[in-house]
Amino acid sequence: MNKEKLIAFFKKETILCISGALAVVSAFIIPPDAGYIEYCDIRVLVLLFCLMAVMGGFQQLGVFDRMANLLLARARKMRQLATTLVMLCFFSAMFVTNDVALITFVPFTIMLLERANLREKMIPFIVMQTIAANLGSMLTPVGNPQNLFLYTISGMEMSEFFAVTVPYVGVSYFFLYVYCYFQGKQPLVTEKQEPKKQWSGNDKVFLLALGILFLLCLLAVFRIAPYQAIFVVILVWFIFFQKGILKGLDYNLLLTFVFFFVLIGNLGRIPVIRETLQNLLLGREVIVSFLASQFISNVPAAVLLSEFTTRYDLLIAGVNIGGLGTLIASMASLISYKYYAQAEGARKGRYMLYFTAMNILFAVILLAVNLFIPYLPVVHLA
C-alpha cells in the first residue's frame, strides 16, 4: 500500500519529486555550506504564499462563481457563450493567477455545458480556456509564478515589464476573440445559476478584508510596501479568521521553488555548467526558454535559466510563450485536463489532439510576433 501511495504521489507531484531528487544529487557535488543560505529568494516565496492565501479566501466565498453567473446571464448565442467562458479565464488570470482561474471556471464550464446538453463543446471550450488563462496571466507580475519570480529578481520597473508583455497579450486577445466569434450565432438558453449560498454579514466583512489584503499584496509585489510586514498581516488574518485556507494551500509549489533554488545555486557554482548554459542562452533566450518549458514546465524553466542570463525581458517572453505546447509546459494546463478527464464521457485522446494542435498554433503565432515585430523589446535573437 505504501508503494502505491508513493507512485500516486509521484504521478501527482512529478515536478516536485524530480526537482527534489536533482537538488539532492547536486548537493553531493556542492556539499551544503553557508552559501546555501543565499540560494532561496525569500521574497518570492513569501509573495507566492500571500497571493495563494488571499485567492483561496476569495474562492471560498464564491466570488468567482458569482462573477461568472452575472456574465453568463447575458449570453444568448454560442459565440457569446464562448467569449464569456474564454475571456473569464483570460482576464481573471491577470490578477488571480492562471491556476486559480482554471480551478474556478473549468468545473463551472463542465457543469454548464452538461446542463445545456452541449457536451460536444466541452473539449474546445476547456482547451481555449486553458490557453486563455496561460496567455492572460502573462500580462501582470502577479499573473503566474514565473512572472512573479522574474519580476522580483530582475528589479524591472512596471513600465518595462508591460513593454514586454502587452504586445503578446494584445495579439493573444485578438486571436482568442476571433476563435470565439467563429463559434457562430446558434441560439442557446443559459440559466443564471444561483450561488451556493447567500453572503452573510460575516461574509461581507471577510470580502472587504480580503480585498484590502489583496491590495496589500499588490503593494508588496510592486515594492511599495515591505513584503515582511504584509506577510505578517496576512498570516495573522488567516490564523485567526480563515485557518482552513492555510491547510489547503499548494505548499508543494513553494517546496518545488526551494528545490530549484538549491539546484540552480549549485549548478551556478560548477564552472563548466555555468559557462555552457550562459553560452547556450546568449542570443537564444526566447527559444531556449520556450523549449525548456516543454520538458520541465515554464515555472522551473524560469527559475533554472534566470541564473545564467541577465536578459529577463527575453526570459519573460520565452517562458510565457513556453506555457503553450505540451501538457506539462504549464502546470496550469494539467488542472484543466484533470477536471475534463473526470467528466462523464471524457474522450482523453481527442482532448490531447485538440489541446496540442491549438497550443502549437498559438505558440507559432506568438513566436512569429517575437521574430517579426522589430520594435518589441524582446526581439534580440541574433
Summary of predicted features, one role per range:
Residues 2-4, 174-235:
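Long, contiguous bundles of hydrophobic transmembrane helices that form the permeation core
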Residues 87, 91-135, 149, 303-317, ...:
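Hydrophobic transmembrane alpha-helices that form the pore/transport pathway of multi-pass ion
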Residues 162-177, 287-382:
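C-terminal transmembrane helix pair
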Residues 41-44, 73-86, 115-125, 204-208, ...:
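Membrane-interfacial loop-to-helix junctions in multi-pass transporters
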Residues 118-185, 190-197, 338-368:
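Membrane-core helix-loop-helix motifs of multi-pass transport proteins
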Residues 39, 61, 65-68, 212-310:
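Transmembrane helical segments that form the transport core of multi-pass membrane transport proteins
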Residues 5-12, 34-44, 156-168, 199-203, ...:
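Interfacial loop-to-helix junctions that mark the boundaries of transmembrane helices
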Residues 4-29, 41-53, 206-215, 223-238, ...:
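Hydrophobic mid-bilayer segments of alpha-helices in multi-pass membrane transport proteins
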